[in-house]
Amino acid sequence: MVNVIDYMPGDTLLHRLNPVVKLGLAAAIIVGIFLSDTYVALLGFLALTLALGAYAGVVDRLFSLLKLLIPLALIMLVLQLAFMRDGNVVRGFITDTGLITGSKACLRLLGVALPLILMLMVTKLNDLANACVEVLHVPYRYAFTFTTALRFVPVFGQEMNAIMEAQTARGVEYDTKNPIKKLKLMLPLCVPLLISSVGKTDATALAAEQRGFYLRTRASSYKRYPIKGLDIAVLAISAALIILGFLF
């Protein structure tokens, strides 16, 4: 999970798209999933995301993310079955409405989590920030904050692993199957991680200020991000995906 959103170099059409268009495509898939109400549409959007990942050469990372999300999806399914009392009883406390609602919720969870991660894998964060500033006219401070937060995710993951390894060397066992016990073991790790994050944030803010962060404008970037014909075609496909989600 530490490297799941790291940029994967490539020369595919997906890599060459305008970063804003990539975000639009990911948003269209997510909106389409929320609008869809049939298994065919939900599975279709999920298959489309995996197919795009295979084309971009990052499908193995998507599958690793799916492995992490499946237990959470199963927990959601159990909760839906336990609390949804509408419909006909299938067996025990399970109703047909609860089964249908829970299974669709699981597919939505899996489908919504992947598109944005996929787009981050095929987009450099600097390009994403600069394109949002140039094309969407987002203030640079907001784009910088968003991309910096994404950069800190793998850094904090590595620091968490380092702290856990140090604690394991002292005899702490984190491989327990008891979730409550594991939570009690993980909570104390948040204190050193929080202190480290505050220090890194302060150092980043100081470095940005010394480099004239507040003087940066849309024209400060030397690289341009024009919307080309391929980008327009992908935007049209994105609109079609939203319409398909609404219809199905």
PLM region descriptions:
Residues 1-23, 27-41, 45-48, 158, ...:
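Transmembrane alpha-helix interface motif
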Residues 46-53, 69:
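Hydrophobic transmembrane alpha-helices of multi-pass, membrane-embedded glycosylation machinery
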Residues 69-173, 180:
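Juxtamembrane/interface alpha-helical elements of multi-pass membrane proteins
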Residues 18, 62-63, 119, 153, ...:
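Buried hydrophobic packing residues in well-ordered domains
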Residues 35, 51-59, 122-123, 246-247:
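Structural signal for the C-terminal ends of transmembrane alpha-helices
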Residues 39, 58-59, 138-142:
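Membrane-helix interface segments
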Residues 58-67:
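Interfacial helix-loop-helix linkers and transmembrane-helix boundary segments
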